Every structure is written in C-alpha cells, then in structure tokens.
Amino acid sequence: MVLHVYNTLTKSKEEFIPLEPGKVKFYVCGVTVYDLSHIGHARSAIVFDVIYRYLRFLGFEVTYVRNFTDVDDKIIRRANDAGTDCRSIAQRYIAAFYEDMDALGVLRPDLEPLATENVPGMIEIIRVLMDKGIAYQAGADVFFEIEKFPGYGKLSGRQIEDMLAGARVEVDARKRNPLDFVLWKGSKPGEPSWDSPWGPGRPGWHIECSAMGSRFLGKTFDIHGGGKDLIFPHHENEIAQSEAAFGMPFVRYWLHNGFVNINNEKMSKSLGNFLTIRDVLQKVHPETVRFFVLSKHYRSPVDFSDETIGEAEKGLERLYGTLGAVKERAAAGVEEAFQEKALRGQDPELFDQIAALSGAFREAMDNDFNTAQALGNLFSLQRHLQRFLDKFGRKQLKGPASALARAGADAIRDHALVLGLLTREPEAFQAEQRSLKIKSTGLTEAEVERCIELRRQARQDKNFAEADRLREEIEKKGIQLEDSPAGTRWRVG
C-alpha cells in the first residue's frame, strides 16, 4: 500500500514521496494569539495531528513544526485595549491554546517557534528579495512586487488580471500593483519594532512562515498545511516570496482542511454563532469533538450543530460500549494460546473481520487520510463484535470465545489510537460523559447515586412499587437506569 495525498498545488491526488526517504518535514500555520481559539482552529489542529500520527504510524521520522504568530495588528490592538504589552497578551493566549489542545488530545509538534524569535531570518529573506529587485521600499514599508514572480497565483489557481478586476484591496498609492503585499511594516508609536536596513519596524504576516519554515525544515520541505482560508493570500504569498528568494520550489505537497459551519451558516462574531473551543467543551466531551472532526473527510466542509454533535456522541458511545462489554464479560484470565481453528470456529465472520481490519484501515488512510472511511471500518468490526457478544446474553465468555472477543476489542482500540480516539478506559469515558451531561438535569451525581441506593434497598426489601416509583421519578428528570449483574449503571438521556 502507498500513501496518496491531495496536493492543492497540482489540484490532484499524488503518491507521497518525501524528499529524503523515511523522513518527513511538515509545517502547519499556527494561530495568531490574540484571543481564545475557536472550533475552526480545533478542526485544523485535530486534522494535522492525525496526519502527524499516521505518518509516524507508517514508520516515518517526522519533524513537525507549527508556529505561533505573536506579533500582529490584532495582538497590538488587544494589548492597547487591555493596557498591557503584546508579549503578555501572546503568553496568555498561548497558555490557553495549550489547555485547549491538551483537552482535545492534540499532540505537541516537535517545534513551535514564535514569530518574534525569528525576526532576523525574516529580515534576511527581505534583504535577498531587495537585492534581486523583487521587493521595493515605499516610505518606511517594504513590498513584494508580484509581477516580478511569474508563478504568482499557481496555488490558488487565480490569474493576476482576474484578481485585479475583482480586487477588494485597500488602495495604496505607494504600491506598484494593488496586489503587492507588505514584507516589512515601518514602526508606529506604541508598536513593537526591530531594527532593519529599512528602518525600525516589524515583519508582515506572510514572511513569518517563510522564515520559520525554511529555518527549521530547509528551503524546500515536504508538507505545508493549513485551513482553506489560508490558500489565498497567505500561502500564495509564502510561495512567491520563498521561491523568489531561494530560487527553488518551497513545498512539495500543500494540504488544506475545509471550513466549519455552525448550523449551516458561516461562523462569525457578527452572526452571533462564534464558538470558542472552551464554549464547546462546557457541554461536549473533547473526544466527541475529535470524533466529530474525523467523521468527515478533512477537505470537506463540516456542519457543527446539536444534531451532528449528537450523532458523533452516539457513535463514540457505541465504540466505548462494546469495548466496555468485552472488558466486563471477556476478562483475561490465565492466558491460553488458541489455535486459529478454535478462534475461527467461534465466529468465522468476526474472525475474518479482525484479520482484515489492518488492511482496510491502511487502505482508507492511504487514500488522502480518509478518516471517515477508516472509522467506518472500525464500526464494521464493532457491529460484528457486538452481535457476537449478544449471542451469549449476559453470560461471561470463556476460552476461545473470550479470546476472540478480546482480539476484536484490541483491534478496534489499536487502530482508533492512531486517530487519537478511544484513549480512555470505557468506564472513565462514561463517568466523564455523565459529569458533563448531568448539568442539564439539575441533579448532582451524588443525588443520582442516592436514588440508586434507595431503589436497591427497596428491591432488597421486595418493595417493588417503591423501586418502580424511584425509577420513574428519576427517569422523568432525564436519567436512564440500566440494571446488570454487576449492579445498576446510569446515564443521562
């Protein structure tokens, strides 16, 4: 099997061949740290986290770089409004970003450079562009002259003439072309600045990623990722300035994730549907958010709504439910090595599903990281495994039946972990779910446990009318009770 990825640059799916065999150099544009991160940031972070995990699963040695933009107009405005400095604002929101990412199970990249710590490299690239006559100084600012770069527009598929005709760029008489973009901004009162050959100032946004990508990964590297909103102008401008300066291709494969809509509308503060990651995690389990993101192909748009999150929640609960049932009813005792014939004899179809999962999972993920299809493969095995368990009613499984069930559960979990899913024990996930969802009932966990204990006592006393009354009373408040040989469990909804 061979990994294929969709390359935005060529508009086609291509075999992935890294520059150096066995090694992958991978850069993703990080957040601008002036506010809390939103659900769109969560999608991008989760998508590229899974790509990072899968590349390592395939055996690649991956160097993953994701930057922080910690100097920007928005950060400056936020600092001025708060009566503090840009560094304090950036540090506050970097810390908040890490908290959100840790909750979502997003691995830390290998390197996370700050833009402010890489300004000398940005100045050097601008100096090269000036020396080549591709950049020009206008007042205290320095601009990139797009007409000096013949390939401008090749990533986004736009023609300069068409862009000019439909341009909604602010008119700046200093520019030679309205689409020329800033490389260096002359200093203004109250703004951070660095010394440069063109006077004190700060870098433009686009030059930051070119400098950090080339510093840590080389002048040409394998993968550059980000949201589709970054294709133009940010990534287009990165290509132009990098290739003009270095004289070689900047990136081999450009990967872009799709947008997140809220109830089928574009997310925006003006529409009042802007959701921070923290807003969402007040009500939704972080692993459910992750499952939701991965249930669609990364290039497709996704719609975030109560309905779609509810579907993700049910799907994740099904997987955990089956794993929990195996753990409860097929617990490993004295390990025995069963022959294939004995295991297959328990359920040939389940045995074959377990054996086929690895290949099916690889086939899905090798097809441009198709996590939706990969999850479908996990659910196919989960359904067969649950049917197998159901054949035994509530009995404990023994011998080869127990071994087969555990093999199925292990296969599901091992492959889910590549996606960063099923990272908890089933009972821990269920407890976390209850803690989140009980808020909507007005009850506390202690009150539910007290009701269960009173009902248990009533049943023990053979006062079944009282036991039924207690059950009906708590179910009216949205709590479902499930009796089992191990005791009574409860869930919300």
From Swiss-Prot:
Binding site for ATP: 269
Reactions this protein catalyses: tRNA(Cys) + L-cysteine + ATP = L-cysteinyl-tRNA(Cys) + AMP + diphosphate
Major localisation: cytoplasm
Coiled coil location: none
Compartment(s) where it occurs, according to its Swiss-Prot or TrEMBL record: Cytoplasm
Motif ('KMSKS' region): 266-270
UniProt protein name: Cysteine--tRNA ligase
HAMAP family on file: Cys_tRNA_synth
An annotated GO BP: cysteinyl-tRNA aminoacylation
